[in-house]
Amino acid sequence: MPHNFRPGDLVFAKMKGYPHWPARIEDVADGAVKPPPNKIPIFFFGTHETAFLAPKDLFAYEKNQERFGKPNKRKGFNEGLWEIQNNPHASYNTPAAASSSDSEDNQPAAASDAEEEEEAVVPRKAETGSDDSDSGSEDQKKPAVKRKAPALKRPPVKKARASSSDRDGEESGSPSEPEPSPSSDSDSGKNSDQDFTPQKESGGRGGKKPAGRGRRKKASSGSDSDSGSQSDQKAARSDSEDEKPRPAASGSESQSGSKSDSDSEPPPPPPPTRKAPQGRKKAEKPPPKPRARKPKPAPERAPSSSSDSDSDSDTDRVSEWKKRDEERRKELEERRKREEAEELRRLREREKEEEEKRKKDKETKVRRGSSSSGSSSSDDEVDDHPLKKSKKPPPPPIPAPSDSDSPPPSELKKKKESQKGRQKKEKEVKEKKERPVKEKKPQRSEEKHKAKPKAEKPKRKPVRPPEKKVEKKKEPSPEEKLQKLHTDIKFALKVDNPDIEKCLQALDELSSVQVTTHILQKNADVIATLKKIRRYKASNAVMEKATAVYNKLKLQFIGKIETGKPKPNEKNQEEQDAQNTDDSKPVNGESEGERKDVSESESNSKPTDQDNPDENKSPNGIRPDPDEPADQLNDSTEADPTADADVKEDSREQDEQMSSES
């Protein structure tokens, strides 16, 4: 890679999409915009365009002449090779027509005057020329968006690169095109219009680039408005074409460079006006300038625009036909789908109606209790209905429009026939299924009538067995007897309606019940009621009977607990003493072993046994039977005033009842 390049060095410059191009390193003019970092301003021979390139894309001319100096078909390349050898100090082409562009209003200038003007305007070219030259270099070497900045004022550049002769036309024709008068156009034609004119069909890029160069010279000569107008007109027509041909590799670089060049050198008053609008290229420049120059450039761009429009129109037509065909196909498919969906809906609705009618017929038959003949006739009637309805579905009116739009009537007929076949098959299957069902229904109805009484019988049965079970349960269990008798006694001695006879019967039964200590422990309330009844003053018979039963139960407990538990009551002390003397004798037919077992079982007594530990302890130190404390409590309650008060209240109530009855 070349090391350090200096202004004036001859090099081969490489841009993306272009061969190594003969070029020269330019010097940055005073006041011009500085190139971006690590970029070098380049002047391309043959096209006379400028760009900013990195040092890696530059190759020394002398060293690489044999390698890159071979002729090429690229437009302007061969001219560049000739120019770098014969005129290495060449600058922007400025034919004599440039003077005429400067003096459009008054005088056509000579070629010598034009050359002098070129020299005077060189800095300006660095500014505006750099715009167009940079953009041109982008167009040919590395076309990019920079060209768009002025490119908005330039026609498409895509096809201009086709031949090297066209670039010559660009160089020579650039000053001539922007000029308002046809004479300037003819002057530009003198240089290289012969090469350029045959390529107008391709919308030659020469037309655009000359517009840019014309602007450069006009900026120097004061004809910026004219060149701007033409470039604006061309840009308006071919903005889309400008964007297509340019690779964006170095466009941003050249664009920034060209903008900086054009904006940096506004010493004369006209360029500052350019500065502001270039910030808004599309907004301000096109409206004022293109109006004056529209009529002349129109014929120049007519062929290219017409060719482009023709090609576009052809493609548009093809795409339109395709779109229409696709739309038609979609519409046909949608219609077919809709028709099929509607037919299916109709079939389903008809099937539902048939099923409902059949159900109604079946219900009516079951109610009337019609015979099998009636059911068969109804089957025939039901069969007639689907036949009548099957005739309706085939002629749906909807498929007609699809026939008009689409050419497949045969397909629709096939579909109809297939649908008819399906309907018939479905109906036959349904009829086969329904016939046995209809025959079975009367049988089922009879079975239901028979099943109903059976269902009622089990409801009655469960009521009876519980009574038997209750009786069976009550007979064996003394606990239940005790509880029942206890409740009977309570109800019999109610204050409102005392039933003494019933109470006596219950007491008799209670005395006959075989009771164990465990049962009495669970039902201590029975003993408490017996205690209270002993003082029932309303009837002496009840008092006597209750005392007898109470004493009997008490004797049973005392007999069991003789050895270990003396009674605290004074009444029973004598009996306990007598029993203590006869420890060895069994009481109530019990042996000593049984007594011990009972005493052990009674050792787990209730907490009530611990109320009077001194009284309950026997001389042997054995705890009393758990049933004894109940007796003791009962005895203690006899002496309590609360028990006496209860008895007195009962007696008073009974006396009041007797008095009221009398």
UniProtKB/Swiss-Prot annotation:
Basic and acidic residues bias spans: 234-246, 314-366, 411-456, 464-484, 562-574, 645-655
GO CC terms of this entry: cytoplasm; nucleus
Annotated Polar residues bias: 84-101
Subcellular location: Nucleus; Cytoplasm
Pfam short name (any one): PWWP
One of the record's GO molecular function terms: histone H3K9me2/3 reader activity
Main location: nucleus
Domain PWWP, chain residue ranges per copy: 7-64
Basic residues bias spans: 143-161, 206-219, 277-296
Top-rank taxon: Eukaryota
Disordered: annotated segments: 84-484, 561-662
SMART domains named among the record's database cross-references: PWWP (SM00293)
Keyword Aminoacyl-tRNA synthetase: no
Low complexity bias spans: 172-186, 220-233, 247-259
Coiled-coil zones: 320-370
Gene3D superfamilies referenced in this protein's UniProt entry, alphabetically: 2.30.30.140, Conserved domain common to transcription factors TFIIS, elongin A, CRSP70
Role played: May act as a regulator of myogenesis. Promotes the repair of DNA double-strand breaks (DSBs) through the homologous recombination pathway by facilitating the recruitment of the DNA endonuclease RBBP8 to the DSBs.
PANTHER family named among the record's database cross-references: HEPATOMA-DERIVED GROWTH FACTOR-RELATED, HEPATOMA-DERIVED GROWTH FACTOR-RELATED PROTEIN 2
Family affiliation: Belongs to the HDGF family.
Protein name as catalogued: Hepatoma-derived growth factor-related protein 2
Organism: Danio rerio
Name of the encoding gene: hdgfl2
